[in-house]
């Protein structure tokens, strides 16, 4: 009898707990459809099942909001304005959204879990963003750790981007071995030295990342990217390698790749001010796009200089392109500084970090650096050093343009 009573009591407790969980779920989780009103326009508004992130909901409706980090909450790009619904702003959003913006309803779409009807506002240019399945034309090393990925846009399609813009690229779930990468012999020494071929990239879900374009608008029918492989830091080799760069480095001619865009804010100002471009590493991409656009498409007569930092001569690329531009345009000069030139380089040019070279060989004796426009893209340490140098010279924020994606 006692055993039967014990079993009955235990069963009763379990049933009560199950009922409590179901009750809580019914109150806390909205499982029905919700309505999302977009810009007060019925044609843009939609209904969708509740419970997903707003960024994903918009994407499923063909509305592609920029998200360089792929929805991780770290880039702060997927801003929307929520007029109704959405709940309270989350701590993860406050590093990107100030109090004034939060009061106006600004939110990060990747952080908003949709549980109720929403009224949102989006910039009109977002509705010009599209998605394409492209074909890989080529994927070649331009430096030891940088590939140039060239994609063919589908016939009859056009990506209406501006110089300095970027696209988002999708990496599917994958299991990629670095041993399968196509790395030319001239670059394999460093790969072997750091034992990089031992790595694998194993990912179980689709990932999205942003890359600045290296081509300019008159180079039609293609998208060209400069992609640096993101390997684990030497002191922490157990950190997983970069998801997207691993995927891109594995691509071969003929492969299909999904992109969306165009996006961007790193655009040239329409003024007559002198333009000074500063780049390093894969930050070459938007530099090339801007400079080619200014000189080849716009036929700009503005004074333009380009200062690029590389480790050694083997890490330099597009030299012939920029040499030709310099020969054809008297208003353009470009300069390279090597931080670690090798004996075989026989280098007689500038050495050291590019911000120091720029300061000592140009800006220190410039009559008015504060009147110039500075466009930069490179590794974080380079960007920080350049910005500090410019601030010390009295350059205002409005004349310092930074692309955080290309480096």
From Swiss-Prot:
Which PROSITE patterns is this protein grouped with?
2FE2S_FER_2 (PS51085), FAD_FR (PS51384)
Q: What is its main location?
A: membrane
Give the cofactor note text: Binds 1 [2Fe-2S] cluster.
**Catalyzed reaction equations:** a ubiquinone + n Na(+)(in) + NADH + H(+) = a ubiquinol + n Na(+)(out) + NAD(+)
The family database entries (PANTHER family) matched by this protein are listed as:
NA(+)-TRANSLOCATING NADH-QUINONE REDUCTASE SUBUNIT, NAD(P)H-FLAVIN REDUCTASE
Q: Which family does it belong to?
A: Belongs to the NqrF family.
Q: How does it assemble?
A: Composed of six subunits; NqrA, NqrB, NqrC, NqrD, NqrE and NqrF.
- The protein's role, per its UniProt record: NQR complex catalyzes the reduction of ubiquinone-1 to ubiquinol by two successive reactions, coupled with the transport of Na(+) ions from the cytoplasm to the periplasm. The first step is catalyzed by NqrF, which accepts electrons from NADH and reduces ubiquinone-1 to ubisemiquinone by a one-electron transfer pathway.
Provide the protein name. Na(+)-translocating NADH-quinone reductase subunit F
Species of the source: Serratia proteamaculans (strain 568)
Gene encoding it?
nqrF
């Amino acid at each position: 009898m006692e055993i039967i009573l014990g079993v009955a009591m235990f069963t009763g407790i379990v049933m009560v707990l199950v009922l409590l969980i179901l009750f809580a779920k019914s109150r806390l989780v909205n499982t029905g459809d919700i309505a999302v009103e977009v810009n007060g326009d019925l044609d843009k508004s939609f209904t969708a099942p509740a419970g997903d992130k707003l960024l994903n909901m918009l994407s499923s409706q063909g509305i592609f909001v920029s998200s360089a980090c792929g929805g991780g909450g770290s880039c702060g790009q997927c801003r929307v304005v929520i007029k109704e619904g959405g709940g309270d702003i989350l701590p993860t959003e406050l590093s990107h959204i100030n109090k004034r913006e939060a009061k106006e309803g600004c939110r990060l779409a990747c952080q908003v879990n949709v549980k109720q009807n929403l009224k949102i506002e989006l910039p009109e240019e977002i509705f010009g963003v599209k998605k394409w399945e492209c074909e890989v034309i080529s994927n070649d090393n331009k430096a030891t750790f940088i590939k140039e990925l060239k994609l063919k846009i589908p016939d009859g399609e056009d990506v209406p981007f501006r110089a300095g813009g970027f696209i988002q690229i999708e990496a599917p779930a994958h299991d990629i071995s670095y041993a399968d990468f196509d790395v030319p012999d001239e670059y394999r020494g460093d790969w072997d030295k750091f034992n990089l071929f031992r790595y694998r990239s194993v990912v179980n879900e689709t990932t999205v990342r942003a890359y600045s374009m290296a081509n300019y608008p008159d180079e039609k029918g293609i998208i060209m990217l400069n992609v640096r492989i993101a390997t684990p830091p030497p002191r922490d080799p157990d950190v997983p390698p970069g998801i997207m760069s691993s995927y891109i480095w594995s691509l071969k001619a003929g492969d299909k790749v999904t992109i969306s865009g165009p996006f961007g804010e790193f655009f040239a100002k329409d003024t007559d001010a002198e333009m000074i471009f500063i780049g390093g590493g894969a930050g070459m991409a938007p530099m090339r796009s801007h400079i080619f656009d200014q000189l080849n498409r716009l036929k700009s007569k503005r004074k333009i200089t380009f200062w690029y930092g590389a480790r050694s001569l083997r890490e330099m690329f597009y030299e012939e392109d920029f040499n030709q531009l310099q020969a054809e345009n008297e208003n353009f000069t470009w300069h390279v500084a090597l931080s670690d030139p090798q004996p075989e380089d026989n280098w007689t040019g500038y050495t050291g970090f590019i911000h120091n070279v720029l300061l000592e060989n140009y800006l220190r004796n410039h009559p008015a650096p504060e009147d110039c426009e500075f466009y930069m893209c490179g590794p974080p340490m380079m960007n920080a050093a350049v910005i500090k140098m410019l601030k010390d010279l009295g350059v205002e924020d409005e004349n310092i343009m930074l692309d955080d994606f290309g480096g």
